[in-house]
Curated annotation (Swiss-Prot):
This is Transcription antitermination protein NusB. It comes from Chlamydia muridarum (strain MoPn / Nigg). GO terms for biological process: DNA-templated transcription termination; transcription antitermination. InterPro entries: NusB-like_sf, NusB_fam, NusB_RsmB_TIM44. NCBIfam families: nusB, PRK00202.2-5. Involved in transcription antitermination. Required for transcription of ribosomal RNA (rRNA) genes. Binds specifically to the boxA antiterminator sequence of the ribosomal RNA (rrn) operons. Keywords: RNA-binding, Transcription, Transcription antitermination, Transcription regulation. Belongs to the NusB family. HAMAP family: NusB. One of its GO terms (molecular function) is RNA binding. One of its GO terms (cellular component) is cytosol. It comes from the Bacteria.
Length: 164
């Protein structure tokens, strides 16, 4: 299986995997890596062994998750601008680190999949709910789901470009 991830507009990382890594587990690893790097931005070297131990996954899978993490971080300013423009009752900075990173990760995945093979928004919303229940608190889910729902609805309503 070959997957590509946009790290920025000019760079695309291509990763070959022999066996598909479960997307749920991948999202959990990416979320944990995003959290760890926000807490200790210089800690990427120790992060590989920590995630291997804590998540019981191979080095290859951790490196694969870190590739997604780096792509999200490379696009963080654009993601945050869209999120801040959508959030009405507070700011992105006032959310917990986990909530911010769930929003960034799911928005990034939604944007990336619009270009290749779209994942239904219902699946992304269900996965967001699962991650909130596992890593955050349920009370925060309504804001996160409302923000993502609003963004996903805007994208769905945009007219497709016409070739002339």
């Amino acid at each position: 299986m070959i997957m590509s991830v946009m790290a920025s507009d000019s760079a695309r990382a291509v990763v070959c995997t022999s066996r598909p890594f479960p997307k749920q587990k991948l999202r959990e690893l990416v979320l944990q890596a995003l959290y760890a790097l926000e807490m200790a931005p210089k800690g990427e070297d120790s992060l590989v062994s920590l995630l291997m131990t804590e998540a019981s996954v191979s080095k290859k899978n951790v490196l694969y998750a870190l590739m997604f993490c780096k792509a999200i971080r490379a696009n963080q300013s654009e993601l945050d601008a869209l999120l801040n423009a959508t959030i009405r009752t507070t700011t992105l900075a006032n959310l917990t680190i986990i909530e911010r990173n769930i929003l960034r990760m799911m928005l990034f995945e939604h944007q990336q999949n619009q270009e290749s093979s779209p994942i239904p928004t219902a699946v992304l919303i269900a996965e967001t709910t699962r991650l909130i229940k596992k890593f955050s608190y349920v009370e925060g889910s309504s804001l996160i789901l409302a923000v993502l729902g609003s963004i996903f609805d805007q994208v769905a309503q945009e007219p497709a470009s016409m070739c002339g």
